[in-house]
Design a protein with these regions (language model features):
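Short acidic-hydrophobic sequence patches enriched in Asp/Glu that either
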Residues: 81, 188, 227
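Extracytoplasmic loops and strand-loop junctions of Gram-negative outer membrane beta-barrel proteins
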Residues: 7-14, 66-73, 168-174, 182-184, ...
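Outer-membrane beta-barrel architecture
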Residues: 26-30, 86-90, 189-191, 203, ...
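Exposed loop/turn and edge beta-strand positions of beta-sandwich/beta-sheet ligand-binding modules
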Residues: 23, 83, 184, 198, ...
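Residue-level "hotspot" positions that anchor or transmit function at local structural transition points
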Residues: 17-19, 77, 178, 182, ...
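Outer-membrane beta-barrel proteins, especially TonB-dependent receptors
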Residues: 1-16, 24-28, 144, 170, ...
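C-terminal beta-signal and adjacent terminal beta-strands/loops
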Residues: 108-171, 181, 191-239
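Gram-negative outer-membrane beta-barrel transporters
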Residues: 7-121
């Protein structure tokens, strides 16, 4: 006796489906040279706000044997805000043809937040209990069955044991804003002028080897703030 089994699989292709809206302010201040010290001070930085949203409608695929594949609405994305300054001290000693540059980058404020919005900026998710647990849920706009038929989503589908599984569920903390406390990075650059033909530079980023991690208070995920300490050299020829 032969039996026929129908399974569903998904495939994907690259597509430009993300929109990005970015605005902010860049600034720069030059305080000139402190002549007795042969040192100048520059301050630069920026504030920006970035909003990214996926305009495609992703699929909520359970597995190959499940009866339905959900089609989720567009609008998933994230927000990012950042305000930073860089203080740069440049000391030029002409007598020995050396330039010392010390940079301190300070991130005063940084935050990230996951969003799922409609075209008017309203959140698509809502709180719903499932198996005695609370989740933030996004309803599909429709679903496909194993015969390839598409059906628009109905509120009554949320009470169906199988169809309710293609609703997009996340832990309530997912959409909470994560704010990072201020932090600073110290870097150094030494440049030696070799006559009129070349300059040799030695670079040290995070040479204090500062290690600091940020823990998201909602998800408890950890992110490394400081890059690893590294040293480099650069040779510049003047032709």
């Amino acid at each position: 006796l032969r039996t026929k089994t129908t399974e569903m699989y998904t495939w994907s292709r690259a597509a430009n489906g993300t929109t990005t809206h970015k605005h902010g302010i860049e600034y720069g201040l030059d305080f000139g040279e402190i002549k007795p010290l042969h040192t100048s001070l520059n301050i630069s930085g920026a504030w920006f706000h970035i909003k990214r949203k996926n305009e495609n409608m992703p699929l909520n695929y359970i597995n190959s044997s499940f009866d339905y594949v959900g089609v989720l609405p567009s609008g998933g994305g994230n927000l990012r805000d950042r305000f930073n300054s860089t203080f740069r001290l440049i000391t030029h000693i002409p007598a020995i043809k050396m330039v010392f540059t010390t940079s301190v980058q300070v991130v005063w404020y940084e935050s990230t937040q996951t969003i799922y919005e409609d075209e008017n900026g309203n959140s698509r998710y809502y709180l719903k209990s499932y198996e005695d647990k609370d989740y933030l849920v996004v309803d599909p706009v429709g679903y496909y069955d194993k015969q390839g038929r598409y059906t628009a989503w109905s509120p009554a589908d949320a009470d169906d044991a199988d169809k309710s599984r293609i609703m997009y569920r996340t832990q309530p903390y997912l959409y909470e804003k994560d704010v990072i406390k201020p932090w600073a990075l110290l870097s150094f650059r030494f440049t030696k002028e070799i006559g009129r033909v070349a300059e040799l530079s030695v670079i040290a980023n995070n040479f204090t080897n500062t290690k600091k991690w940020h823990t998201n208070p909602h998800s408890l995920a950890k992110t490394q703030l400081y890059p690893d300490m590294y040293f480099g050299a650069e040779l510049k020829l003047k032709l």
